[in-house]
Amino acid sequence: MALMQIAEPGTAADPHQRRLAIGIDLGTTHSLVASVLSAVPTVMRDHDGKYLLPSVVRYLGGGGIHVGYPAVAAAGQDPHNTIASAKRLMGRGHGDVQTLAGHLPYDLVPGEGMVRLRTVAGEKSPVEVSAEILRVLKERAVETLGGEPEGAVITVPAYFDEAQRQATKDAARLAGLNVLRLLAEPTAAAVAYGLDKGSEGIFAIYDLGGGTFDISILRLQAGVFEVLATAGDSALGGDDMDHALAEWLMQEEGGDASDPLWRRQVLQQARTAKEALSAVAETMIVLTPSGRAAREIKLSRGRLESLIQPVIQRSLPACRRALRDAGLKLDEIEGVVLVGGATRVPAVRAMVEEFFRQKPLTDIDPDQVVAIGAAIQADALVGNQREDLLLMDVLPLSLGLETMGGLVEKIIPRNTPIPVARAQEFTTFKDGQTAMSIHVVQGERDLVQDCRSLARFSLRGIPPMVAGAARIRVTFQVDADGLLAVRAEETSTGVRSEVVVKPSYGLNDEEIARMLQDSFIHGAEDVVRRRLSEAKVEGERVREALRTALAADADLLDPAEREALDKAGTALTNALSGDDAGVITAAAEAVETAAEPLVQRRMDSALRRAITGRSIDELGD
């Protein structure tokens, strides 16, 4: 998620009156809400004593809605109207989720913008689905706290981009929540363990949930948290362990593998057994295939670990990638925090300990740790805590503009801590140009065609001037939640235009990793392509200037000079049709050399016109 500047917003007028605030972990599989009660971060429970709320929503024909456990119970009978894992779809376009579509039991509606889901209650967006989950969590908080919270800190993955963060804020707004901050999940976990109050160092946050895996490397320095690197696998989690065990059980027991009721029974038993074996060495599984007597199967922890070992090993490449991106060695990691229910599995903890060469922190329930950190942060933001807490996130990819020739001018490089604002001046390319098109892009490549387009807007009303005279100041501003605003202003008139970037789709961690990898693989090639494009832009500028000068003052040249200049201009035109940057640059320089007599005479002529009819005294003035 985006890291943020958090300053003390002020304390309550009455020092004994605490303001109500909540922290929400809006998860892919489960969600939960917490608050600081009597100075103790506490996760809130429902009427049945459960603190986890399944992130599942079921829409009913009569307009009713089931959220959480009732929705899960009906998933088998009503899969098309029961929406799970909506978080995977937040801020995503229809084209982005084609790889997921075949694995989703519900129907996606084709169209532009954010993906929508077809239900008996009409089309629903992931934002609307998430809002229902947040609404239930808010109601739980109101009942527990005895009043409306002033605001909420909601956690998001560190790799969430502008679109995904904005979608999360929109969902909260629909649920009637005032969002104090969006907080990176790994940062929230670190806050929960009080790492912000300890010594400086570098920490790894290993987050293995039900459906996703994330690894984040944080640096704590002078009270500031900074996310150095993130990596992960959005298709890896505890569910994969359940499926691995379920497949083995079906092979052992037989039964009709195509029968959804049988598969659901086996999967549920597998999940229960996995959870039990986190505490005991052996457990019994009871299966009742259709038309057959019930059968008991003894399952040991050792057998489970052998079955799930390939699953948990899949998390290690991402760990290595995060360390490599952060430029760190294993011995530089001060501590490892475990997040996510799947990290309760002893085999996972053993593997993490072996990989990082140290015992991970496990004192706080891994299901609760993110919500607890969010609650602590929310408590600080409403003024209940005296100490400042500064949290910083970084941009996952560079932000920039398209310039002439399809080149990218990076304004804010990747890994820049946010919030941040950067400005740069640009100018016009042609004489009399009165408008400029601004194209905002994201990525590490040198050419626009290889980057992701974020937004386009125009600045109009630029005073007509010669090419290169106008000054257009473009400012990029990324706020604490990672949302981008771009403003363009012509400095002499104050004419301005701006856009708040809210893309209709987002990027996941694999897409960000792919974009970074492409920038490394094609680095040398991009340098060559950029050099060629820059040479062509400069060549076109020289050719345009030559046309303008000849149209106005060709009579200042003698025939030999005009012939030499025409010949140089033709050579430049021919060079521009080729792909040799060196040839283009040499041809442009030859034109400028041949044009020197014309340039000098134009200046002399302009000077004579300026002083004609004026006295020496007037010129002195």
Swiss-Prot record:
Keywords: ATP-binding, Chaperone, Nucleotide-binding. The lineage of its organism: Bacteria, Pseudomonadati, Pseudomonadota, Acidithiobacillia, Acidithiobacillales. GO terms for biological process: iron-sulfur cluster assembly. Coiled coil: none annotated. This is Chaperone protein HscA homolog. Chaperone involved in the maturation of iron-sulfur cluster-containing proteins. Has a low intrinsic ATPase activity which is markedly stimulated by HscB. InterPro entries: ATPase_NBD, Heat_shock_70_CS, HSP70_C_sf, HSP70_peptide-bd_sf, Hsp_70_fam, ISC_FeS_clus_asmbl_HscA. GO terms for molecular function: ATP binding; ATP hydrolysis activity; ATP-dependent protein folding chaperone; unfolded protein binding. Belongs to the heat shock protein 70 family. NCBIfam families: HscA, PRK05183.1.
